[in-house]
Amino acid sequence: MAKRKTTSGSAPRARASARTRSAASRSRRPITPQDLLCLVGVGDTQMAPDGRSVLFTRKVVNAKNAYETSVWVADADGKRAPRALTTGPKDGLARWNPDASRVAFIRNDAKAAPRIMVVEAKGGKAHELLEMPHGTVRDFGWSPCGRRLAFSFRATAEEWTPEAKKHREDHGLSNPPRVIDDVWYRLDGDGYFGAERFELYVLDIERGALDCVFDRDTLGNFSWDWAPDGSALVIAANDHPRASWNPGETELFVVSLGDRGKHVLSKIPGLAKGPKSQPRWSPDGMRIAWAGRTGPDGMYGTGNVELFVHEFQAKRTHCLTAKTDLCLMAATLSDSGDPAFEPQLRWFPDGTALFFRAGWHGSGRIASIPSHGGEVAFHTEPGAEFNMGTFSADGWRLSCIRSSPLQPAEVHVLEVERSIFPMNRVTAFNDALVAELELVAPEERWLTAKDGHKVQCWTMRPHRAKGKLPAILEVHGGPHAQYGLTFFHEFQLLCAQGYEVWFSNPRGSKGYGMKHTAAIRGAWGTKDWVDVQAVLAAMRREKGIDAKRIGIMGGSYGGYMTNWAVAHDHGFRAAITDRCVSNLVSHAGNSDHPEVPNKYWKGSAFTDPRAMWKSSPIAHFGNVRTPMLIIHSEGDLRCNVEQSEQVHTALCTQGVPTRFVRYPKETSHGMSRAGPPDLRIHRLHEILGWWGRWMK
């Protein structure tokens, strides 16, 4: 990667004095649940090939309690205010054409089928290129030559299209049954898709011809990339007939595009077994990079997702990150944006390096490694969360999104150098709101568990707090993800209500190396609980905390740990379990991701459930005395609502105070960060009401 001689970072801001900051803090107000509706979301940044502008999506809540997304463009130097390029309300996946003169994007109207639209980069009316049948489009992009567009598309089954639903309503007919022939027929946040699968299509813009070029992936979970000359596509896909139980059977396919639909499909031979995702063709066309691992496990799990490069001529593959302990899927969780679960992988335009996002010790950082091997270099500072966009054609600029505990996500452009990259912040959508609010910065601590293991945690104490406060321990979901240094509305809200908030990354979390993550493989409620106990012990020793008013809460796996904690420790004043797991045996059979026997857990739910049952909180609920608020979505396909029903029944049977809040089937497992806006606010009021009842 060549070194740049000069940069054009944004002008430094004057640092306020302590007295000025204190006065500003006193003039600000506490954050409220309703402020969640005022946050502006940004995503999917795309650097213009000429490096002058950056595309992104902007997401807001409208007056009708719905999310609107539109495509915006900003100058890369941040000197002019960003401007809307499309009108929405459901526009996204915006992509520059190779000469940056036009932008293609996907328009998803509420009742219409998805359409491919094109608008001039300088603005104006968007024109339709193609209307697809009713369905879902993802992974959209121009060919490098600009003659074609490729995209993944999954059709909606005919009986579930808007037209079919309206016909039934008009004629008083019932909805049809769902007839299922495979275990893969639903996904949380995506809903029920039955036998329909994503397929890869290529649109020849000049001829107006549309071809399906790949339909071999058993689950439809493939990812792809263009060859640098636009003549072919590389696809990471699993065509094993039992792909759900064999994620390691992923292969790399190449589709060579011929004239008038004459395409040739081949497979790259000699690759090791293992999951593969986000294949990326090198700029010279001689190598393919991807994120994955070797072995039978899938992408999500206790092992590190690593970076591989395959050389076509030498017919050999290198794992570039083998000597590191980084994971390319260490997502940082938040309620104010989408976690970066998918690997983010980019070639530097001259082919000398590969860039990726690495989650480490609570930060999400942009890093790189030489493409022929070497040391990892970090290019963004710790203490924030970065999500990577794309490079300009010359490689001197890289788009990204940055958030921090005191700053919701905004679009930035990095000026590329070998060390820490200077940044231009090009959006300020949330600045006016932030200027009103009294926000709290987390303070880092490292604790030692009783077995000597080090645990990173953070504390947030309300401003001007005096005396002993009630405190809340938040436990993250996953479990193979991390809490960290990003904007978290819920944490700030609890602080504003007078609670000291603690959060940590116990064993099982990502961001601390594979040994830390794998410590609880098939053994939840063991070393993770040891680490949580270390945090609890520190809270109970803290001089500013009332040890008799400590609560615990968490969602998903965090709900699991909340359930486990109250079954093994009677020192909590109250608890909140959200979209929880309580019974691992039943969860193995009713989640959208069924458990593979004798993989993550020893045995299986239907042959030898002993390990799962031993680790199930519900097996220990005869000991629970702690008042609990239970929150769950009836449309949760990840952790079925029956998990919370079991908790509720157990508590009611024993006379333990409880309140069960069930959100309708239109909501999913991700309701706290992506659910209907009014229900997200309702959830926050329920949380505050429960803590106010038991902790004040």
Role assignments for model-derived ranges:
Residues 4-21, 68-69, 154-201, 246-253, ...:
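Predominantly five- to eight-bladed beta-propeller fold
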Residues 34-69, 195:
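Beta-strand-rich domains and repeat architectures in extracellular enzymes and scaffolds
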Residues 39-54, 88-106, 126, 132-149, ...:
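Conserved beta-propeller blade repeats
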Residues 44-46, 57, 150-152, 173, ...:
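Non-catalytic accessory segments flanking enzyme active sites
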Residues 64-68, 109-114, 191-196, 243-250, ...:
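Short, solvent-exposed loop/turn segments at conserved positions within beta-propeller repeat blades
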Residues 75-78, 120-124, 204-208, 256-260, ...:
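Short loop/turn segments that connect beta-strands within beta-propeller blades
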Residues 241, 326, 429-548, 555-556, ...:
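Cap/lid segment of the alpha/beta-hydrolase catalytic domain
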Residues 503-696:
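Active-site-proximal cap/loop segments of hydrolase catalytic domains
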